[in-house]
């Protein structure tokens, strides 16, 4: 037990430690707090990794050049002869106008505007309408042709219609279908009807009676 005992000799051990207020060693730190950021004190050669100087952004240059340098004007060339300069300016102006002028764009005419002049040319150039340039005769010929075409259309519908209802629908008089059905009028009776017969079954409008009589006259 004599060999195993706690040593009693006093020994001074020097260890690195953080400066304390007792030793007043913190006064040796020279840090400009207005221009330096630090989160831990600086002592000797020890510096905090969070230490960074504060610099004004105005003194730094942007790595990207301003846009105004990208649009620099080309260096001025020697001025040519005045006559050559005028000729070149006139030629350049002429090229600029001819090249940048948009091509003319013409809208196509509607189909109705193309068909109507062709009809008028055919009517005026036909031998039936040849006259002494009288407007009245021309209008009469046009009206007679219109009526003949209308009559041919009516006769085609009447000849190919299956019943009276189809004829009335062709003339736009489908409202009177019930009147003809109640009177038991078929295609044979319709062809022999007169204006008084139409009034009897309820067709009181003169315009409607005239339209039906025009169709019956074409038969």
Curated annotation (Swiss-Prot):
PTM remark: Probably ubiquitinated: degraded during the oocyte-to-embryo transition by the anaphase promoting complex/cyclosome (APC/C) containing cort protein.
Pfam families reported for this sequence: SAM_2 (PF07647)
Region (Disordered), start-end ranges: 74-104
UniProt subcellular location: Nucleus; Chromosome
Main location: nucleus
GO-annotated molecular function: DNA binding
Residue intervals of the SAM domain: 159-219
PROSITE patterns: SAM_DOMAIN
Gene Ontology biological process terms in this record: distributive segregation; female meiosis chromosome segregation; homologous chromosome segregation; regulation of meiotic cell cycle
Keyword annotations from UniProtKB, A to Z: Cell cycle, Chromosome, DNA-binding, Meiosis, Nucleus, Ubl conjugation
Subunit structure of this chain's protein: Interacts with polo. Interacts with cort.
Name this polypeptide is given: Protein matrimony
């Amino acid at each position: 037990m004599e060999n195993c005992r706690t040593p009693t000799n006093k020994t001074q051990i020097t260890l690195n430690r953080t400066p304390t207020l007792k030793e007043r060693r913190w006064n040796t730190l020279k840090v400009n707090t207005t221009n330096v950021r630090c989160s831990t004190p600086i002592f000797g050669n020890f510096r905090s990794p969070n230490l960074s100087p504060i610099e004004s952004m105005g003194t730094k240059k942007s790595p990207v050049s301003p846009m105004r340098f990208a649009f620099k004007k080309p260096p001025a060339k020697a001025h040519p002869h005045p006559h050559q300069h005028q000729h070149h300016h006139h030629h350049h102006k002429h090229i600029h106008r001819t090249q940048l002028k948009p091509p003319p764009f013409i809208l196509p005419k509607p189909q109705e505007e193309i068909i109507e002049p062709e009809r008028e040319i055919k009517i005026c150039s036909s031998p039936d309408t040849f006259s002494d340039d009288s407007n009245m005769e021309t209008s009469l010929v046009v009206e007679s042709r219109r009526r003949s075409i209308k009559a041919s259309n009516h006769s085609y519908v009447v000849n190919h219609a299956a019943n009276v209802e189809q004829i009335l629908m062709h003339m736009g008089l489908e409202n009177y279908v019930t009147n003809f059905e109640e009177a038991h009028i078929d295609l044979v009776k319709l062809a022999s009807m007169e204006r008084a017969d139409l009034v009897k079954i309820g067709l009181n409008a003169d315009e409607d009676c005239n339209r039906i009589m025009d169709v019956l006259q074409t038969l």
